[in-house]
Every structure is written in structure tokens, then in C-alpha cells.
């Protein structure tokens, strides 16, 4: 199979939405029957985003094979059916680590190691490997053209363009076309300068995607075409929209997919975007709304919970309601108590690390349990629910996780001390182990207990979900907690680890050690999120009478 490559770069400013644009183009090409994958090349020195602050970088998206990746890979999976893996995201740090390891082994036979050709060759090899087996591979380059960090990646794709030829490569550049209110007009000069910068390093863009708060008029697109030496039909206007799921149709209406197909000389069917039209219709025509309180510690940056936010929206589509998310700082719950939890239709406690704000999350779980309010706990959200139950129902007053209180007399949650790494080797871990790459990661089979809400949601006795954590329920306390009324509704593939808990005498109190948000999509939703929103809607109706 001959793979074609579309390289996506960004200019003028960051956060233009390269990932959304790349994913939307991929969705159109997939709708034309093509097998598409997407890669993200990140120019930072970190080996992966696993140890980066969520308030700086946003969430860490976990793939099926356990890679800790950029949040853009979440967008990719939500827009196309192809599942991402560790080949779909790599960083400058990963490349340098790989090259330096080879140098230490003597693989370069005494050569002087340089950015060109050794670093660029390593980048090119990964890009080619990531695209294998697909009709089209879209490669997003992180950062902004002009940044010093991006230069090795840009040089690598320049070389690939020359080596593979025009019939197998296409360069798509996103730029900002701002509207100046004082002047009352759109300005194209930033785009012209960005293209000039890109051309100065040897890359001539084939497509320009012009971002702005309004559509770019035909005369301005003609001007951009003239000064940037790009065909006028290849100057695409991408205005702000109220839903990212409208973007595939917006790009298709301007013929972007047709331009790509003709460039690559691919024979394929017309795009069928009916699934996306249905998503847009459901989003625009809700029958009600619910308010979900998300009690977390990274709420100053909503992207820290990007996949959770999207999964709640998807569940809203399936229940035909708008989901309003109220972000609640768990430290505020500690300071003010129940008053900040009033008026909610459901509470969701997402994952997180560290002691800050954990007591607020425990209070949120207690409030939901005592007030029969739908509760959904994810990862740490399950652990705090279990800790709360142990303290206030099972009679273990000082119960805690050893992550937060190693001296707790009732360590109901403890560190995973033995684990199998990605190479199948046994690893021993302790509190002083490295933070990066030392967690239980990736898709794992879970056995569901018959007659539980978990089994009802999944419509079966097993599920497969992705994990990202170091701590697990301490099996020494399972019997005591079970006798107190806690239901262990999900167990690991070997039935040795607790994966899900729930309460019997509660309308909907369900929590999982895994991250179901990573597999939710706008077209398919996710059974647990759908069940949670359905329960929240039912709670609202009961309250309103």
C-alpha cells in the first residue's frame, strides 16, 4: 500500500486548532472510504506529556497500547474510527533519547552525531513507520512556524516532501486572518509573513487554512492566493463555529477533500457525512438540559479534563439534552462545604494526582451518597468514593490512600508494587520510583458482576477500558467493605484487582478505576457516561416533581 502524507503546520499564533482541522480533514477522507491515520509531532524536550502539569499542557490522552500522549490524539479518535497508538505521537525528547541510546551502543560507528542527518532521519523513520498500512497519514507539527524548537521537524518534513514527491505529499498551513474592529477590515499581512517564514525554510504550502472569527471574503482569499503563491481554491476559510463537529462539513463545502483526492490521484467514493449531520442535529435540538458538577483540582484550565468534557457532551447527545458543566474547585468544597454542591443534577469526580484538594473530593462523594445524587467517579474519583464509604459507613474513621497518608491505620487504597512493563518484564515499584512511564497504562479487560448497574450499562459481563494510575484498592479490606454494603461490580482480567464499585441503595452511584472518557466519541457515546446523564436527568425530574 502506498501511503500519502499531509503535513499540517501552524503560523502567526498558537492554539489555532491544527488538531481539530487535521482531524476534520481526516473525518472527510474516512467518509470517502479511505483508511486514515493522524500523527502529532511535539517539539518539547519532555519524553512524553505524562509528567507535565495538566494546567500547562492539558490532559494526557492514553492510547489502547498504553502510550501517554498529547490531548490532540483524543480529538483524532473522536473524529475517526482509527485507534491511535504509541506511533502516533512523539516528541523532541523521545527522538533525542532514541538517538543518544544508539550513539551509546555504538550504532553510528563513531560518527559525529548532528541534527542533520541523525535527528532528522530518526524523525523521518518514525513518520514513515506511523503511516504504514494507511491510505493517508496526516502529520501535525506542534508549535508555530518560526519557533526554534520546531526546526528539526520542519526540516524533516521538507526532506520527506523532496524524497516522496508531490504525488505523495501535501503541505497544509493554518494561519490567523484577524479582523480589526477599529479599521473594520480583515488583515492578511500576518498570513503573508507566516508563509514567507515557511518558504524560507524550504516548504511551499499547497493549502492555506485561514482561521478567524468570521469567514474570509472572496476578494481577500484572492489576495492571499496572489501574495502567497497558492491556488485560490486552496485558500480555505475556517471561521469560528459553535461546535467543532461542524468543521468537517465546513471544510468539505469548500472542496478541501476534493483538492486532496485530485492531488494524490486517488479513486474513491463521495464523502458520506450523514453521521456527522446527525450529531449536529442532535446537538442543535436538545429536549432539556442538566447541570453536572465536576469537582476537580485543575479547573482553571478546562483542557485538563478535555476528554471528560467531550464525553459528557456525547452522553448529552445520546440523551437529547444539553450538558452544562459547572467546574468546582475541590479546595472550595473543603472551605465552604455542601453549599457549593447545591442545585446540581449529578456530580462527577475525575482523575488527578497529589494530596491538594482530595478531602474536598471525598466530601463531594459523601454529599452524593447521602443525598441520592447521581455520582460518577473516574480513577481517583473511585478511590475517594471508596475512602468516604470506608470512613463513614464501614467504620474505618481514618481510612485513606497511602498516596496521601502512608501512616493511615486503614490504607484502603495502596501503591501497585509489582507490575509488568510494556516489554513483559516484571517491575518492582515503590514511593521513590520515577514518575514517568511507571503506571498501569492502556486497555485492560474488566469482568462485570451480573445484576449491577455496570453490567446493565455495558449490556454484558465484560468491558475493555484504559487505565492510568499507580494506586489500587487494597484487597485486604474488600471483604469488610463488601459486608458494609459496597458492591465491587468490576474486577481485573485475573480477578485480583478491583476495577469498579457501586452502591445498591442508590439511584446511580458508579465509579471505575479506569478512564472511560478516552473511548467516548460523538457518534457512539459511552455507556457509563450515557447512564450517568440519564440518571442525572431522572434525578432532575424527581426534584421538579
From Swiss-Prot:
<dbReference type="Pfam" id="PF00117">
    <property type="entry name" value="GATase"/>
</dbReference>
<feature type="binding site">
    <location>
        <begin position="15"/>
        <end position="20"/>
    </location>
    <ligand>
        <name>ATP</name>
    </ligand>
</feature>
<feature type="active site" description="Nucleophile; for glutamine hydrolysis">
    <location>
        <position position="379"/>
    </location>
</feature>
<keyword id="KW-0067">ATP-binding</keyword>
<dbReference type="GO" id="GO:0019856">
    <property type="term" value="P:pyrimidine nucleobase biosynthetic process"/>
</dbReference>
<dbReference type="InterPro" id="IPR029062">
    <property type="entry name" value="Class_I_gatase-like"/>
</dbReference>
<keyword id="KW-0479">Metal-binding</keyword>
<keyword id="KW-0315">Glutamine amidotransferase</keyword>
<dbReference type="InterPro" id="IPR017926">
    <property type="entry name" value="GATASE"/>
</dbReference>
<feature type="binding site">
    <location>
        <position position="470"/>
    </location>
    <ligand>
        <name>L-glutamine</name>
    </ligand>
</feature>
<comment type="subunit">
    <text>Homotetramer.</text>
</comment>
<dbReference type="GO" id="GO:0005829">
    <property type="term" value="C:cytosol"/>
</dbReference>
<comment type="function">
    <text>Catalyzes the ATP-dependent amination of UTP to CTP with either L-glutamine or ammonia as the source of nitrogen. Regulates intracellular CTP levels through interactions with the four ribonucleotide triphosphates.</text>
</comment>
<dbReference type="GO" id="GO:0004359">
    <property type="term" value="F:glutaminase activity"/>
</dbReference>
<feature type="binding site">
    <location>
        <begin position="239"/>
        <end position="241"/>
    </location>
    <ligand>
        <name>ATP</name>
    </ligand>
</feature>
<feature type="binding site">
    <location>
        <position position="223"/>
    </location>
    <ligand>
        <name>CTP</name>
    </ligand>
</feature>
<feature type="binding site">
    <location>
        <position position="72"/>
    </location>
    <ligand>
        <name>Mg(2+)</name>
    </ligand>
</feature>
<dbReference type="InterPro" id="IPR027417">
    <property type="entry name" value="P-loop_NTPase"/>
</dbReference>
<feature type="binding site">
    <location>
        <position position="14"/>
    </location>
    <ligand>
        <name>CTP</name>
    </ligand>
</feature>
<feature type="region of interest" description="Amidoligase domain">
    <location>
        <begin position="1"/>
        <end position="266"/>
    </location>
</feature>
<dbReference type="GO" id="GO:0003883">
    <property type="term" value="F:CTP synthase activity"/>
</dbReference>
<feature type="active site">
    <location>
        <position position="515"/>
    </location>
</feature>
<feature type="binding site">
    <location>
        <position position="140"/>
    </location>
    <ligand>
        <name>Mg(2+)</name>
    </ligand>
</feature>
<feature type="binding site">
    <location>
        <position position="72"/>
    </location>
    <ligand>
        <name>ATP</name>
    </ligand>
</feature>
<keyword id="KW-0460">Magnesium</keyword>
<dbReference type="GO" id="GO:0005524">
    <property type="term" value="F:ATP binding"/>
</dbReference>
<comment type="similarity">
    <text>Belongs to the CTP synthase family.</text>
</comment>
<dbReference type="InterPro" id="IPR017456">
    <property type="entry name" value="CTP_synthase_N"/>
</dbReference>
<feature type="binding site">
    <location>
        <begin position="147"/>
        <end position="149"/>
    </location>
    <ligand>
        <name>CTP</name>
    </ligand>
</feature>
<dbReference type="InterPro" id="IPR004468">
    <property type="entry name" value="CTP_synthase"/>
</dbReference>
<feature type="binding site">
    <location>
        <position position="223"/>
    </location>
    <ligand>
        <name>UTP</name>
    </ligand>
</feature>
<feature type="domain" description="Glutamine amidotransferase type-1">
    <location>
        <begin position="291"/>
        <end position="542"/>
    </location>
</feature>
<dbReference type="GO" id="GO:0044210">
    <property type="term" value="P:'de novo' CTP biosynthetic process"/>
</dbReference>
<keyword id="KW-0547">Nucleotide-binding</keyword>
<feature type="binding site">
    <location>
        <position position="14"/>
    </location>
    <ligand>
        <name>UTP</name>
    </ligand>
</feature>
<dbReference type="GO" id="GO:0046872">
    <property type="term" value="F:metal ion binding"/>
</dbReference>
<feature type="binding site">
    <location>
        <begin position="187"/>
        <end position="192"/>
    </location>
    <ligand>
        <name>UTP</name>
    </ligand>
</feature>
<feature type="active site">
    <location>
        <position position="517"/>
    </location>
</feature>
<keyword id="KW-0436">Ligase</keyword>
<feature type="binding site">
    <location>
        <position position="352"/>
    </location>
    <ligand>
        <name>L-glutamine</name>
    </ligand>
</feature>
<dbReference type="Pfam" id="PF06418">
    <property type="entry name" value="CTP_synth_N"/>
</dbReference>
<feature type="binding site">
    <location>
        <begin position="380"/>
        <end position="383"/>
    </location>
    <ligand>
        <name>L-glutamine</name>
    </ligand>
</feature>
